[in-house]
């Protein structure tokens, strides 16, 4: 009701006031997840130039970052976002279920509304003193693991499912052994932060743990910011992490920002934007640009797809809802 009254009032003001009195600036808010801060800071600058050239309007983009699940809950509970760029499809579906995003949002943009991808890797201290090579090593005695909480972080759910996929292959689908494997891994977790950036801070800046399970881009950013202190280990099995994007229909309709919000997400697929994504260590969906960065990205790693486990609705229900497998195996 409040939003309807706002929209009515705005329409009345627009009808009575000359357009030029409002100037030529439009503002939108992008609610995103933890590791995209630096990338969107760069992207927003080129998008503002693109929008100015295309329409003559100035645009200001506000960013909001945090654990993906927590961010989705904030939007569902009323945080105004013109667009959401979250860690996984399920988090956007939760906003859809709150009635703020129209059904079929996955088909509004290319590649199922996933303009870039990532995967999960390990970040270890230079020289790899614990000799960590694969997921098995994260279950050994004396190894301290840092990973975010899958109850609040989308990246953490990708981490968990990458480990689950490894256990699936190792134990040929025997869920009893798979659960035991995941339990041993989480018994070694020394800190369970609410989001991916918090986990990176715990490991890189606070010196907690021996290995950080991380988004590929987070690991590379840490190596860039702390040269000669860390190295990346790519496990034998990981997962194709597909962050998703969507326009928040209810918000853009009452704010009158649908055109600029839609173009904001569309332009993420442009060559210029795909280069920025690659520079920030996200994998571009443009295959040509991805291959141009093959010196950075390991394109030979065995990446499973979340669809192999029934998609995010099934995975969320089985693993991460209250009483799910994560609750079974994680001893607080």
PLM features: residue spans?
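Ligand-binding pocket segment of bilobal, Venus flytrap-like solute-binding proteins
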Residues: 171-236
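Short helix-loop capping/hinge motifs at secondary-structure junctions, enriched
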Residues: 127-133, 152, 165-173, 251-258
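N-terminal segment of the mature folded domain
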Residues: 23-152, 300, 330
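Positively charged n-region of N-terminal signal peptides that target proteins for export
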Residues: 1-5
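Sec-exported extracytoplasmic/periplasmic mature domains
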Residues: 44-53, 76-80, 89, 96-100, ...
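Short beta-strand->loop
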Residues: 31-33, 124-126, 144-171, 185-189, ...
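Extracellular/periplasmic juxtamembrane helices and adjacent flexible linkers that interface
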Residues: 252-332
């Amino acid at each position: 009701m409040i939003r309807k009254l706002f929209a009515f009032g705005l329409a009345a003001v627009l009808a009575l006031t000359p357009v030029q009195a409002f100037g030529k600036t439009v503002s939108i808010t992008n609610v995103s997840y933890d590791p995209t801060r630096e990338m969107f800071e760069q992207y927003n600058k080129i998008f503002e130039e693109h929008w100015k050239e295309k329409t003559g309007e100035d645009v200001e983009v506000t960013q909001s970052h945090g654990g993906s699940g927590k961010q989705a809950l904030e939007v569902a509970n009323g945080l105004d976002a013109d667009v959401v760029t979250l860690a996984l499809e399920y988090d956007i579906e939760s906003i859809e279920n709150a009635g703020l995003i129209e059904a079929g949002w996955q088909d509004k943009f290319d590649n199922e509304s996933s303009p870039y991808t990532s995967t999960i890797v390990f970040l270890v201290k230079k020289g790899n003193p614990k000799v960590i090579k694969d997921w098995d090593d994260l279950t050994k005695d004396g190894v301290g693991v840092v990973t975010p909480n899958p109850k609040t972080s989308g990246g953490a759910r990708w981490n968990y499912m990458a480990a689950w996929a490894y256990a699936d292959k190792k134990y040929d689908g025997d869920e009893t052994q798979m659960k035991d494997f995941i339990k041993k891994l989480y018994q070694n977790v020394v800190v369970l932060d609410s989001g991916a950036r918090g986990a990176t801070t715990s490991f890189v800046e606070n010196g907690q743990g021996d290995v950080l399970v991380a988004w590929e881009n987070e690991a590379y950013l840490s190596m860039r910011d702390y040269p000669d202190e860390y190295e990346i280990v790519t496990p034998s099995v990981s997962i194709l992490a597909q962050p998703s994007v969507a326009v928040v229909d209810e918000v853009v309709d009452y704010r009158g920002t649908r055109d600029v919000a839609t173009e904001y997400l569309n332009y993420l697929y442009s060559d210029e934007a795909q280069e920025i994504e690659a520079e920030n260590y996200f994998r571009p969906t443009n295959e040509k640009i991805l291959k141009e960065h093959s010196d950075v990205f390991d394109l030979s790693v065995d990446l499973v797809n979340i669809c192999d486990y029934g998609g995010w609705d099934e995975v969320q229900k089985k693993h991460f809802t209250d009483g799910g497998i994560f609750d079974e195996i994680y001893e607080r």
